[in-house]
Amino acid sequence: MRLISKVLVKTNCLEVGMRRAPQWYSHYSTTAGNARVNKKGSKVVPVLTGLALASIFAKKWYDDSQIKKADVTSVAVDASISAFPKKMGPPQWPFSTQYELIGKGVRCVSSITFKAYGLGIYVAAEDKHLVSEVLDSKFLSQAFIDTAAPPSPENSHQDNLRAALNDPAKAPILINNLLDSGIRLMSKNTPIKAGSFKLLMDGTKKSVLKNPDSQSQDKDRLEAGFQELHDCFRSVKGLVARDDDFFIELNKDCSMNLSYYARKKDEFVILGTVKEPLIGKLLFAHYLAAVDPPSPEARKEVIDALVSLS
């Protein structure tokens, strides 16, 4: 009991040997992989020890009454999980910028009948202009989008763009150009069934490897990136509750910030950063351009959003 009370006591982050938070988490005191904070930034505790984790199993894992229903600020994805916010960012959420939801759906594993996660794709509000700058560019329009000769008066540029984004050969080219522009994106993965941190890590790695472009990349760089991914999960063990959130922020350089939100405890865990840009680029290209994406529904909505922004 003395150990548990010591772990849960409120304390200043500098007193437990943690470095100052990065500038873009100005009012959150935490260290990647080593601390948890609530979203208000009012409490800092070390990562749960095995003793503290053991207490979880003595409690009911999740109460359905905690599921937040959709309102004017959110949209429903699945009845088993809370509605997804239309906008996410500081000060309520310790992300690098403000994000807006552009696509959501259910992510299935193994079988179309097995619902694993709710998936949301967000775009940085400040970067929405990049969609039209890239996808309306003269080069991409002439080479991949508005390619009918002679041009069809019945099809607008937006019609042609939608067709190109649904074309298995053209979509990866267009999406990769968009990712190369420095657009910031974020994925929100919310378990519909309780899982584990290992499943989150393995699922992320598998999504990267499902991108056909991964087969032609430098293997050493890929392995280095996967090691960084593994390191982000090194200090978190055990089960992941239904309706918790796993976030992946794609930065301008295609590095990724990984974080986790434990809804029942209102605690936000900064897992770390995957600096190797190949991992981030391959992952989000798989989300947005794959023939067999993790969530076809989410990809369809993202395509609709990209067309409307062009």
Curated annotation (Swiss-Prot):
Record SUPFAM superfamilies: Chalcone isomerase (SSF54626)
Keyword Mitochondrion belongs to the record: yes
Keyword terms: Mitochondrion, Transit peptide
The keyword Magnesium is annotated on this UniProt entry: no
A molecular function GO annotation: intramolecular lyase activity
Cell compartments where the protein resides: Mitochondrion
First and last residues of the transit peptide: 1-20
GO CC terms: mitochondrion
Any Pfam family hit: Chalcone_2
Main subcellular location of this protein, as a coarse class: mitochondrion
Protein family: Belongs to the AIM18/AIM46 family.
Protein name as annotated: Altered inheritance of mitochondria protein 46, mitochondrial
Species of origin: Saccharomyces cerevisiae (strain YJM789) (Baker's yeast)
